């Protein structure tokens, strides 16, 4: 069983790298790629960089090098629903672009031509993630995650996304490209994102800066528990 784990930033990946046995590091273009074992499971860790293009490149490199049985995207996200607190976890039920628009040709808003309108996360991976017992007070939610190449922090941005996608639970900048690449290569995936800021609040960028590193620890804990479960396969 080989598991691919992808994060955008070093801060989102460091705790996982520290737990790797027999760790080897390789630079692949702009991406840092680590291989080794966690709890006896062979894993690849990829720091892909921020944004959808970087994420697609990193995911493709990961698939080519590791040939994983599944992909997990870990990191942080902005929360859209009021019940969520900073540090809570969102497990993706589905993932979608919020900044794609080919509606002139009959596609849904957020749909890339010739792609599904949204990418469904693997139900087995979702169920594994949602059943994890966190050691912290953080809660686990499941719902739609949306991606775009902008940090969402203004009232105008928030209102525009809510108008078009009222079902949104969280927003970030890589997941839809990771999901789309996984879809193209027919590899099961799931996003595990910890809430670093609440986008409807003022100064969400400040909250992100202050809480990002601590919030990322919660998503990493879910990943550790999932890897343990994946010892038995999917």
Swiss-Prot record:
Pathway assigned to this chain's UniProt record: Amino-acid biosynthesis; L-methionine biosynthesis via salvage pathway; S-methyl-5-thio-alpha-D-ribose 1-phosphate from S-methyl-5'-thioadenosine (hydrolase route): step 1/2
GO CC aspect terms: cytosol
Function: Catalyzes the irreversible cleavage of the glycosidic bond in both 5'-methylthioadenosine (MTA) and S-adenosylhomocysteine (SAH/AdoHcy) to adenine and the corresponding thioribose, 5'-methylthioribose and S-ribosylhomocysteine, respectively. Also cleaves 5'-deoxyadenosine, a toxic by-product of radical S-adenosylmethionine (SAM) enzymes, into 5-deoxyribose and adenine.
Pfam family, one: PNP_UDP_1
Protein name: 5'-methylthioadenosine/S-adenosylhomocysteine nucleosidase
UniProt cross-references to Gene3D superfamilies, sorted A to Z: Nucleoside phosphorylase domain
Residues that hold substrate according to the record: 78, 152, 173-174
Family of the protein in this entry: Belongs to the PNP/UDP phosphorylase family. MtnN subfamily.
NCBIfam families in the cross-refs: MTA_SAH-Nsdase, PRK05584.1
EC number(s) on file: 3.2.2.9
Catalytic site: 12 (proton acceptor), 197 (proton donor)
Signal peptide: none
Species this chain originates from: Desulfotalea psychrophila (strain LSv54 / DSM 12343)
SUPFAM superfamilies: Purine and uridine phosphorylases
Alphabetically ordered keywords of this record: Amino-acid biosynthesis, Hydrolase, Methionine biosynthesis
Catalyzed reaction equations: S-adenosyl-L-homocysteine + H2O = S-(5-deoxy-D-ribos-5-yl)-L-homocysteine + adenine; S-methyl-5'-thioadenosine + H2O = 5-(methylsulfanyl)-D-ribose + adenine; 5'-deoxyadenosine + H2O = 5-deoxy-D-ribose + adenine
UniProt cross-references to CDD domains, sorted A to Z: MTAN (cd09008)
Record-level GO BP terms: L-methionine salvage from methylthioadenosine; L-methionine salvage from S-adenosylmethionine; nucleoside catabolic process
A GO molecular-function annotation: adenosylhomocysteine nucleosidase activity
């Amino acid at each position: 069983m080989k598991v691919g784990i992808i994060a955008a930033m070093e801060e989102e990946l460091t705790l996982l790298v520290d737990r790797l046995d027999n760790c080897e590091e390789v630079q692949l273009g702009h991406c840092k790629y680590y291989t080794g074992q966690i709890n006896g499971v062979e894993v690849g860790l990829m720091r892909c960089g921020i944004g959808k293009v970087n994420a697609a490149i990193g995911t493709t490199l990961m698939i080519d090098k590791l040939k994983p049985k599944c992909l997990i995207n870990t990191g942080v996200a902005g929360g859209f629903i009021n019940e969520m607190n900073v540090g809570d976890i969102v497990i993706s039920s589905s993932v979608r672009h919020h900044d794609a628009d080919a509606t002139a040709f009959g596609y849904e808003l957020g749909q890339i031509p010739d792609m599904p309108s949204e990418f469904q996360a693997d139900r087995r991976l979702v169920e594994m993630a949602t059943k994890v017992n966190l050691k912290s007070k953080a809660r686990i939610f499941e719902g739609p995650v949306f991606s775009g190449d902008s940090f969402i922090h203004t009232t105008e941005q928030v209102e525009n996304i809510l108008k078009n996608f009222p079902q949104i639970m969280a927003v970030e900048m890589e997941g839809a490209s990771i999901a789309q690449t996984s879809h193209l290569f027919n590899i099961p995936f799931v996003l595990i994102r910890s809430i670093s800021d609440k986008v409807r609040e003022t100064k969400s960028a400040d909250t992100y800066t202050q809480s990002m590193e601590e919030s990322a620890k919660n998503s990493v804990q879910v990943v550790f528990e999932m890897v343990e479960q994946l010892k038995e396969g999917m």
